[in-house]
UniProtKB/Swiss-Prot annotation:
Primary residence: membrane
Alphabetical list of HAMAP family matching this protein: MurG (MF_00033)
Protein name: UDP-N-acetylglucosamine--N-acetylmuramyl-(pentapeptide) pyrophosphoryl-undecaprenol N-acetylglucosamine transferase
Top-tier EC class: transferase
Family from the record: Belongs to the glycosyltransferase 28 family. MurG subfamily.
Amino acids binding UDP-N-acetyl-alpha-D-glucosamine: 198, 289
Topological relation to the membrane, as annotated: Peripheral membrane protein
Keywords: Cell cycle, Cell division, Cell membrane, Cell shape, Cell wall biogenesis/degradation, Glycosyltransferase, Membrane, Peptidoglycan synthesis, Transferase
One function term, GO molecular function aspect: undecaprenyldiphospho-muramoylpentapeptide beta-N-acetylglucosaminyltransferase activity
Source organism per UniProt: Streptococcus pyogenes serotype M2 (strain MGAS10270)
This enzyme's EC code(s): 2.4.1.227
Amino acid sequence: MPKKILFTGGGTVGHVTLNLILIPKFIKDGWEVHYIGDKNGIEHTEIEKSGLDVTFHAIATGKLRRYFSWQNLADVFKVALGLLQSLFIVAKLRPQALFSKGGFVSVPPVVAAKLLGKPVFIHESDRSMGLANKIAYKFATTMYTTFEQEDQLSKVKHLGAVTKVFKDANQMPESTQLEAVKEYFSRDLKTLLFIGGSAGAHVFNQFISDHPELKQRYNIINITGDPHLNELSSHLYRVDYVTDLYQPLIAMADLVVTRGGSNTLFELLAMAKLHLIVPLGKEASRGDQLENATYFEKRGYAKQLQEPDLTLHNFDQAMADLFEHQADYEATMLATKEIQSPDFFYDLLRADISSAIKEK
């Protein structure tokens, strides 16, 4: 019988990306892969879109909140139902291990796997753990982290960032679509790429719309998340969503303006791409992006600008400072030891799964 592994994680693309990097490697080595998630979540969409040979199991999901809300009462029952469903799935499949990338949907499968004696491996991308992974850590065999964590967390293995981006732009596939975009851009202007992510694109979209003079100073690429804004005109390319074009657009840009999500930041670090971070504040997140941005700035990888300070004057000042010290930022990024290849992590995870099985 083939070995089986269960994956879970969802809610945002960032909670699915690493799973989609690892899953093909397990499939290639003959593992039967299953995924537990929300049928209405981004994880289901991304798994279906990938075309990978993965069996998806839907469970009920409820949001975990640190504050009082009447919705908590309903969500308690959803989480309880999700746990019962997860127990049934794990008991039926009898996988060798479960790997979780976090998000609210991941807690019931993690708890179920632990209760049924299955090794549980989780991954934390941010500077500090979110509520879901704080709970999951109590049930985990091992937690891998992108950032160094507190010493008292005995089950932590500090890994660094796992990314599959091409460091060499020449490795990337050519794109006729990109060539068409370049025809609208000026070679005399710097090219800026705005990446807002699923939760933070609106502010960038509005900033660009409110300041048409930006097009006189820069070539602008704006990943909007909104198909109604799609546009290709002089010095401006607005597109709602990209897949194969994502890395080529980063390579094409002289500088990237991004939110503070860990996945994007470390992709930019791996490519040694000059970037300005405008993190989501605590009113829109739990503050993890602020921590990530401060970490990157202190390491000398990037500069940050708080969202309330995102004015045209402050933006121009930040651009001038970044381009003036571009060589220093790029040298610091090129010297980083914080990036790991997918193959390295896959081999480590496989070894840890084998060790956990032998110890049972």
